[in-house]
């Protein structure tokens, strides 16, 4: 049975002091969480140590928001798996739509990050998704297929999470209909060819739509942005019914 993974991506939010205050409020809210699910938070790099030093660390796992494909070198602004593992990081978000958009990150680069994350002992959360223009032109399936085939080449599906995040739904308040999201997640599972791969949905996930999203057969979790910044909101998402 696939375990549900509820992940919060804080992006460029939260200082160390704010993260500490957040955890103090959040952790009691998830202490009784079902054993069939895992909670993950991806804080800014500067706040990772706040998580790894927290006494109640057992209740959730840490993810980085990106990762490089080398352990060291002249790669300004990048971070390596070796550096992250020192701080108890277990996951790494790869290929999020924002690096794809703002830094022109390619499927080839995303693949290198994902493969190296796995070889270093981390589980990559590889993001895929179409733009509004691509969706309106009927190109969503073609785009997702390309991103999966090129971005996941030579990866181990047993140590992998794929997050379907339709770009037009991120931070816009627009949510992909649960049935439509489930169809894309089913497509991703078929493309990978491994029934037990964990597939998340991301895109304006909130407390008022989490129960419907998680009732879908091919959605195994969510990648949450803005709603993960409030401890009560994210706890409600983690404790979905």
Curated annotation (Swiss-Prot):
The keyword Membrane does not apply. The active site is at 96 (electrophile), 165 (proton acceptor). Its main location: cytoplasm. One of its GO terms (molecular function) is triose-phosphate isomerase activity. CDD domains: TIM. Its EC number is 5.3.1.1. InterPro entries: Aldolase_TIM, TIM_sf, TrioseP_Isoase_bac/euk, Triosephosphate_isomerase, Triosephosphate_isomerase_AS. SUPFAM superfamilies: Triosephosphate isomerase (TIM). It catalyses: D-glyceraldehyde 3-phosphate = dihydroxyacetone phosphate. Gene3D superfamilies: Aldolase class I. Substrate binds at residues 9-11, 171, 204, 225-226. It is an enzyme of class 5 (isomerase). Pathway: Carbohydrate biosynthesis; gluconeogenesis; Carbohydrate degradation; glycolysis; D-glyceraldehyde 3-phosphate from glycerone phosphate: step 1/1. Involved in the gluconeogenesis. Catalyzes stereospecifically the conversion of dihydroxyacetone phosphate (DHAP) to D-glyceraldehyde-3-phosphate (G3P). NCBIfam families: tim. Belongs to the triosephosphate isomerase family. This is Triosephosphate isomerase. It comes from Prochlorococcus marinus (strain AS9601). The gene is tpiA.
